[in-house]
Amino acid sequence: MKRSILGLMYLIHGMRQAGIPVDQRLKQIGLNANAFDPSAVIHADLEWDILRTVAKDIHPELGLDIGQHYALAGYGPLLMLLLTSSTVEKALKNAIQYQALTHLSGQLLLKESSDCVALEYQSKQLDQPLGLFRAQSEISGTLKFLQEIHMMAGLVFPEIRVELPFPPPKDADMLFKFQQYYGRELYFDCPYARFVFQSNIMNVGIPSSDAITFRLYEDKCQMEIVRFQEDTLQSTLIESVRDFLDIQRGYIPSMAETAQALNIPERTLRHQLQQQKTSYKDLREQLIRQKALKLIDDPSVSIERIAEMLGYSESAAFNHAFKRWFGQSPRQYRK
């Protein structure tokens, strides 16, 4: 399953704000965060490979602050779906149903009992520092999401109990930061991360509820899920290379940079692509052609701007390549 690159972008932004040299690390694999395409989608395995480079040796507890850089607006149609739900119960169940549209790598579950309801987050990689860092970031970001969506919906955020699946910080100042952020009822060393509410919250109506708008965004969410579905007919390696090359605008990483990002030797990458009847050069050109056709259909984007977005230093070089691919110049194609 693929997902929006926005989650990775928010993490990188948060790490940069925390003083981590992410831009220098991204450069090692041919990436520039400022050139990332916000509409790009990325496979979870590739996202992990990139994080392994940019978040190397990062202390997991920094996730408390970094996770607060996830932005509510980045949830797109899912945000509107939740805001137009009829009740808090409906909104929570929609969040579970469409959690593939969130920025979470872990799994969300809704656990209900007679007197309380818990939004539970289960991470798969708490046994390694990078996985623990990402989990701490996502748990922190989830609380921020819950608080902000309550505010946007015109609701008061209730008192909750927070359970965290890792030990308390040994540093007293850091422990205080956790207590300040998560509240008075904070418990460590729990099996899973859980945000526990009184069950009566489920029946609370959402002031911004709108049945017509809800159906509109329900359709949009379903369409996004389809867009993120992994193409099972394609090789995982080919998909990883394509996704990596498609991350940013204006520059396409070299084969050496791609191999480093995917954590495999360049020679091995070349050989494995050859075994699958393709090459880095072929995949790169296919991607540029696809992007060129998509951009050329938008009359608001000039030919010169398209050339720049595709990494050409001069529009003449782009014109020559386009004519070689499609038998006519970009301007002729537009007519």
Question: What do the PLM-derived regions correspond to, one by one?
Answer:
Residues 1-119:
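N-terminal low-complexity or simple alpha-helical regulatory segments
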Residues 76-82, 124-128, 203, 224:
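Short hinge/gating elements
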Residues 11, 84, 135-138, 258:
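Amphipathic alpha-helix face/heptad-repeat signature
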Residues 107, 111-204:
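DNA-contacting interfaces and partner/effector-binding or oligomerization modules
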Residues 89, 132-144, 211, 215, ...:
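Short, well-ordered alpha-helical segments
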Residues 177-180, 184-335:
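Extended mid-to-C-terminal alpha-helical interaction segments
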Residues 12, 55, 96, 139-143, ...:
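Generic solvent-exposed, charged/amphipathic alpha-helical segments
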